[in-house]
Amino acid sequence: MISGGGTGGHIYPALALIERLKQRGLLDAVLYVGTERGLESKIVPDQGIDFKTLEIQGFKRSMNLNGIKTNLKTIELFMSSIKSAKKMIKEFKPDVVIGTGGYVSGSLLYAASRLKVPTIIHEQNSAAGVTNKFLARFVDKVAISFESVSDQFPMHKVVLTGNPRAQQVAGMVPNERLSEFGLKTDSPTVMIFGGSRGAPSINKAFIDAVPLLNERDYQVLFVSGQVHYENVQAALANTTLNSNLAFVPYISNMPEVLPDLKAIVGRAGATSLAEITALGIPSILIPSPYVTNDHQTKNAQSLVKEDAAMLIPEPELTGASLVKALDTLFETPEKQHAMAKAAKKSGIRDASDRIIEVIETII
């Protein structure tokens, strides 16, 4: 059984691990447990994976009357979801239960630990999530993606495995998908990407940078995010985009494009960093300031420390600062090569296999 919910950062590592278990012929059956409202309720069934739900919600940080009422309801739901989770576990009879984050994994993993079923949690970020911090005292093993997070868990349980998403993309090779966007397949290309929903600050920086980028030899593939596409289109209505620039709302099967890139500009989410380090792609990271515990900044700093990435704090992001960073990268081939080498060294390309080894030690 496996559970990870709420965001793609919790879901995709779980799916990557399931895929690897299937590839190695180690999976007789799998049940994914999520919530009805989370992204997993659509993504997981679309992969042909058995899916069941628990009713659970997160805690409110504000302690006003509404927050207190919500938190009391959360405690009530947590207690009832443990009962439901125990029933699921007894019916499915798993050899191991794995949690990749999100509130729903808290109920399932806690229930599994009480039933003495082997348990593992996976922490994708360099700052531990609330659910994983809670579960760490109950589970058998804690798999981590960043060495720096190890001191936030009981040391005797911690195993550095990396993020399963890394192994999923590690074998990908250039495939000339850039031609789909009207770009040359033999010119150095950077992708600017604000995450699956896009990022207004990154979009604005690109808009402001277009006059400068039009004059550059390198190519830019800009992904605005579907929800922001029309606004960006309107902002660029009177601006010419030269042939070295391409602008799209989204890219289907994004990992396929990555091997054709010489650099990436984007957020510092755990899944993105797992992918770019697995492939050895230099990056300019703009951590989202809107995430819990500022974990994206901590994620980014782990790569900056290894000289595998550059960092632009969002308040310092402008069209000019973006182009300056890109010019530094593309006009200094030795720096670009060194960053690519450092990025690849930082990646853990056998992450799923490492987690499978951990599974085999506890079942």
Swiss-Prot record:
Family membership noted in the UniProt record: Belongs to the glycosyltransferase 28 family. MurG subfamily.
Protein name: UDP-N-acetylglucosamine--N-acetylmuramyl-(pentapeptide) pyrophosphoryl-undecaprenol N-acetylglucosamine transferase
Function: Cell wall formation. Catalyzes the transfer of a GlcNAc subunit on undecaprenyl-pyrophosphoryl-MurNAc-pentapeptide (lipid intermediate I) to form undecaprenyl-pyrophosphoryl-MurNAc-(pentapeptide)GlcNAc (lipid intermediate II).
Pathway info: Cell wall biogenesis; peptidoglycan biosynthesis
Reactions this protein catalyses: Mur2Ac(oyl-L-Ala-gamma-D-Glu-L-Lys-D-Ala-D-Ala)-di-trans,octa-cis-undecaprenyl diphosphate + UDP-N-acetyl-alpha-D-glucosamine = beta-D-GlcNAc-(1->4)-Mur2Ac(oyl-L-Ala-gamma-D-Glu-L-Lys-D-Ala-D-Ala)-di-trans,octa-cis-undecaprenyl diphosphate + UDP + H(+)
Lineage top rank: taxon: Bacteria
Record-linked Pfam families: Glyco_tran_28_C, Glyco_transf_28
Location in the cell: Cell membrane
InterPro entries: GlcNAc_MurG, Glyco_trans_28_C, GlycoTrans_28_N
Membrane topology note: Peripheral membrane protein
Enzyme Commission number(s): 2.4.1.227
Enzyme class: transferase
HAMAP family reported for this sequence: MurG
Keyword Transmembrane helix: no
Organism: Latilactobacillus sakei subsp. sakei (strain 23K) (Lactobacillus sakei subsp. sakei)
